[in-house]
Amino acid sequence: MSFLLLLVGLGQPVYGQYTSIQDTARCLSVRDSSATEAFGKNTDRQVTAYYYANKASLVDKYFRRGMSRISILNIPKGKRPAPESYLKRRYIRRHLKYFKGGASCIVSKAMLERYDGDSIGKADNSQFIMTKAEMDSVLTKSHGDLSCIEHELGIPSGAWKHRVLVRIDIPKPKKLRLRMASGNEVGANVLWLPGGLLPTGYREAVIDRIPKGKYKASLIVLTGEVNDGLAVPNKNEQK
């Protein structure tokens, strides 16, 4: 098991072992989960598709006159305007308030340890985040299924295959210049949408690179994958 020197709490250095995050929906037995899997997936797709469509349409009314998601997406990456120029101020304030309870993101363990956990983020001093509450929801509903995690977070399918993933929690993102994403960030991919929502409807924002002492790292356990030499069997294969 790997160890990583982290600075936590009030900046006191401690040697901390990664905390493993497994399926938190323990109220369901394996038998119950297997029996309802197909029905649950079909129903979930129908409900969430309707929910996301309505959530996105609510954002549209907060674009300033003459601006829209399509008009912003038609501008090449690197030249897109600041969100404040096309989104109403009250919407931005309300959107960022959701991050008051903390923020989270996912990175690869290899990337984190490459620089000894010194800081997390892209070369342009940016890191995409979502609310801690919604990250909890994503990891709970995914049941350790990597493809589900990728889909929910707007990550191209297979991009994280064969990687050991680490959840990063940031208790106070506001202190790291919490802001709306412009779409010019290095981490903005082809699935990025103006307005602060992922394609699946979760809220996102951007902060500066996260230094030591400002985050907590937890290992994500995936079903059917090997993490640090420990194989985690698929739930449906358990007896």
Language model features with spans:
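Bacterial Sec-dependent N-terminal signal peptides
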Residues: 1-19
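Long, low-complexity, intrinsically disordered regions
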Residues: 16-127, 136
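Catalytic toxin/effector domains delivered as secreted proteins or via bacterial secretion systems
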Residues: 78-238
